[in-house]
Amino acid sequence: MSAEERAERKTQGLKDKKAALNNGELAGLEGDKDLQFLLNGGELTKVKSESWQKKRFFRLHEDCETVWHKSSRLFKKENTFSINDIDSVRHGRESEGLQKYIMDSLEECCFSIIFKGKRKNLDLVANSPEEAKQWVTGLEKIITHMDNLNSQQKSEHWIISCMRKADKNGDNMMTLSELKHFMRQINTEVDDTYAAMLFEKCDTSKSGTLEGEEIKQFYELLTSRQEINEIYGKYAQTDGLMSADDLLNFLRTEQRESVTLEDAERLIEKYEPNLTAKLNTLLTKDGFLRCLTHTEGCILNPAHKQVYQDMSRPLSHYFISSSHNTYLMEDQLKGPSSTEAYIRALLKGCRCVELDIWDGPNGEPLIYHGHTLTSKVLFRDVIKAIRDYAFKASEYPVILSLENHCSMEQQKLMAHYMVSILGSALLTQPLGNEMPTALPSPQELKGRILVKGKRLNKLDAVFNNNNVTVEADTVSEEDEAAEVKGNEQKPKSEKSKIRLAKELSDLVIYCKSVHFSTFENSKEKHSFYEMSSFKESKAKQLAENAATAFIRHNMEKLSRIYPAGSRTDSSNYNPVPMWNAGCQIVALNFQTPCKQMDVNQGRFLPNGKCGYVLKPEFMRNPDFNFDPNNLSVGPWLKKTTLHIMVISAQQLPKLNKDKPKSIVDPFVKVEIFGVPGDRASEQTHHINNNGFNPMWNKRYKFTVNVPELAIVRFLVMDYDTASANDFIGQYTLPLTSMQMGYRHVPLLTERGDVIPSAGLFVHVMLVDA
């Protein structure tokens, strides 16, 4: 780096110091040495391959939310990324690229930035372990602080950031031209007359620019929310402010919450920004808005953000978050296979992952989609990734669903890798000293990894000292493996056979794969630990024509459902009918963003996102005969009316950021999923050219017969007359996890990541029909 460049960067750093400090205060990091380190920046080696490893200067921008890096080329837009786009930062040689291209001795100098969505990971090497640690710690601090902001604080941060970008010359003043640019930045279109009127109203000094208090006035004018003003005005009965008694009245009357005066006082203490008001136990309008947009005001019941269900029931009594073809990042014909795909699925709470294993060169088993052009990943690397990430998002058991195509020798190596790498986490014996009679519970299996696959003998052989040891034998292929080869229609006697090594067989304890023929046959011949896999079409047929028998079967045994082999694009089927039939392991392609994955994410949103959700009692108790397709009187029938008022949206993202004048025309769709009789949807009209604060005030009414199986999805779309409507954001959750009253609905991207500052404001009421 030349002396001139160093001087330029030093000057820029001094210029940015004030703005950076202001943002540091906003992020809660004022005076933080790690933040200062990121603002100063430093050289890092960017790693793409063995031959492509280049020095780049990285620095945190003064807005404290943008990182840019500079090479010998001129500054380019694509050389920046937002803190909001980062999913996680991993210290060490955690990525496939760093493991492959960087030597072990540089382990502590390495770190990876993992992005949300499809953007490739950024693999970096610092000049020292200390610098690497500072980068990782600094970035994690900012990410954590941004995540901990409530919706209102994120909104304020976002608007201020947009204001800064609109201030082209950086003079901390706003001209009329800059104001128009700012309005487009925040996704709202205003005509020249309205913009001029707004500007003139705030330009009290008549200087032709807005500055200081004038900008503050403009900000307050812009962010004032009519719907909040009306609610606040109705309940703020103490000299125009809201006392603890007023707040208690609001919480009990509108929000239908069972709270005390002490609870109301606690909320004021927590959310009121004005110190004088707080000391007098009063809530200003700003404090009220913060209260509505934080955890307590969210549509998701805060109690459901933790594990709150009984986790001591048998595994078969839970819906289990499950992935299909977990190793794929994209489609099933030519997409890449990666350990990263396993990491992402596990971090999303997935508790059943699939491993499609084939013989590899040099005696090393590989994971990939057979008979296709998908890339390959080493089996042992996948097992290491599972070891490292299995229990970061959830402490409850992980099931490895093996689709084994390997020779005897490589099967033995597979068993060796699982035992040696997973260690004590791998379940190799049944729990207890006697042959069990039912599946263990998630509670009993905390921190354990189970293997699902073929087994040579019955489980009771483990307790039979006189048992004749079987070293190897042939077994029929997994049903899904047979489908890949076109054997699924053959009689059982003609199905493909594979030789199974005892070492691998012995690792299958509670999830022994068996072929399904009929429910009667399963009841007579199969034990509780023997489970079957069903192609989606077969499962759908059973769910439609024999739902009660399927539900009863799933009270004792596990069932796994997988997508049809014809879904080469990794598309997904509707999981709801399978859940309605009590199926636990409903495996979806996690790598494919779609409505079905939204519903899956919504199903497993409550209970602390732990990947296990307890089925309703009428799907666990053999005394009941529930049929979702033909509703009769029973404990499942709790007919209720769901009233939803879609009031407004806030700070919807621009879909085409490359076109400054591109503004969304949003509309909202509310969808109900559940038993066939409960499926419904309604949608608002679209609002032209306003993604900043569109308002609908539209009321809808839904009749729900089986609320315990109902799932609600809020979808926001951009209306388009010439082509298909574009996705903006969505949020899905079980009806039983929804809070009543005025609620904030966060919005997620297609890939399930939170959209900072964006949200819906709705009113929800559930009454007996």
Where do the model's predicted regions map?
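C2-type phospholipid-binding modules
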Residues: 408, 417-420, 597, 607, ...
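Exposed aromatic-hydrophobic patches
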Residues: 694-705, 733
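Calcium-regulated, polybasic anionic-phospholipid
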Residues: 349-354, 358-367, 644-691, 720
